[in-house]
Amino acid sequence: MQLPQFSELYKSLILIPSISSLEKELDISNKPVIDLLSGWFSELGFSINITSVPETNGKFNLVATYGQGDGGLLLAGHTDTVPFDDDLWTKDPFKLTEKDDKWYGLGTIDMKGFFAFVLEACKNIDLTKLDKPLRILATADEETTMAGARAIAAAQSFRPDYAVIGEPTGMVPVFMHKGHMSEAIRITGRSGHSSDPANGINAIEIMHQVTGQLLQLQRKLKEQYACDHFVIPQPTLNFGHVHGGDSPNRICGSCELHIDMRPIPGVNPDELFMLLNQALLPIIKQWPGAVDVYHLHEPIPAYACNTDSALIKLAEKLTGEAVIPVNYCTEAPFIQQLGCDTIVMGPGSINQAHQPDEYLDLSAIKPTQAIIQKLIEETCKN
């Protein structure tokens, strides 16, 4: 089998739905994408290892390896996309559409299209002349739980020297980002008729106390922690969603608040979760059994790569761009657990990610192909 042309690689990847979602009716297995990539990389002489990701809806990781042993380069990306709003897209999300020097489609830059760039680079390199292994990692569920990357980190089955995650950065190398925590605070009171407030326990009134404590915690985070690489240097705490009660004439029996916290490098998510619980301790003591604090999903740690890394110096040389920090999250903290220097760098703009009519600007194709090819040659040859 001869590998398709670059545009056909892209078209085939976009054609296959691979949405991940916490809503079961939207969640789709990524196996067809994994099988497609497996066939293509096999054709190039890579050995293939496909593993199921535990506790997922039929999700799989793929590791394609050319060469033996540890070291070398890992090029990593995720096979899933976010869901899409059919009413807002003006083009078919699963059909690669060319218009105004752009390729439109779901996953063009976030980030199935990255694998087409990697395949094209591998086609143009004499892989038999590489001295160190080249690995390609395709993961699952990055857009939800990061279960695929977590499984790879837990397995510790290989150890590259360097890793590049091809998320859309405009090919500007990223060396740092904050983490992400989604936490829930549930208040369980006692409902009753609103004509006799003393005959119940109003969960909204307790939640009012909770928000007061959390506002104090916001100030504490700003005063005690800082990473000056970020425009907003402190760990943040955002009030994202609140719901309580069902009728004006009932004492509210339950109320739930969802918050977002963003740890900075050097601050463990467990530390922030402990501070959250400490802030709420007076209320927990005042209302025994009424306050429940729990993770909506497992936290994602912050990430930072040492700026003295040879990988950073190489990426800056190849792109002509200095490394930057970003505010969004990637799989970098989990890939980094393999023991390798890790950066995030890929084609496309983050401004198009998770947006209707997601697109890749065609002017980025040739420069990106050249950079990825040179990156492989520089890291996998002595």
Swiss-Prot record:
EC number: 3.5.1.16
Cofactor(s) the protein needs: Zn(2+); Co(2+); glutathione
Spans through the membrane: none
Binding site for Zn(2+) 1: H78, D110, E167
Keyword field contains RNA-binding: no
Keyword annotations of the record: Amino-acid biosynthesis, Arginine biosynthesis, Cobalt, Cytoplasm, Hydrolase, Metal-binding, Zinc
One Pfam assignment: M20_dimer
Gene3D superfamilies to which the protein is assigned, alphabetical: 3.30.70.360, Zn peptidases
InterPro entries xref list: AcOrn-deacetyl, ArgE/DapE_CS, Bact_exopeptidase_dim_dom, Peptidase_M20, Peptidase_M20_dimer, Peptidase_M20A
Subcellular localization: Cytoplasm
Xref: NCBIfam families: AcOrn-deacetyl, PRK05111.1
Function: Catalyzes the hydrolysis of the amide bond of N(2)-acetylated L-amino acids. Cleaves the acetyl group from N-acetyl-L-ornithine to form L-ornithine, an intermediate in L-arginine biosynthesis pathway, and a branchpoint in the synthesis of polyamines.
Binding sites annotated in the UniProt record for Zn(2+) 2: D110, E143, H354
Originating species: Moritella abyssi
Subunit: Homodimer.
GO CC annotations on file: cytoplasm
Pathway assigned to this chain's UniProt record: Amino-acid biosynthesis; L-arginine biosynthesis; L-ornithine from N(2)-acetyl-L-ornithine (linear): step 1/1
GO terms (BP aspect): L-arginine biosynthetic process
PROSITE patterns: ARGE_DAPE_CPG2_1, ARGE_DAPE_CPG2_2
Residue positions of the active site: D80, E142
Substrates-to-products reaction catalysed: N(2)-acetyl-L-ornithine + H2O = L-ornithine + acetate
Cofactor comment text: Binds 2 Zn(2+) or Co(2+) ions per subunit.
First-tier enzyme category under EC: hydrolase
Gene Ontology MF annotations: acetylornithine deacetylase activity; metal ion binding
Family: Belongs to the peptidase M20A family. ArgE subfamily.
Protein name, per record: Acetylornithine deacetylase
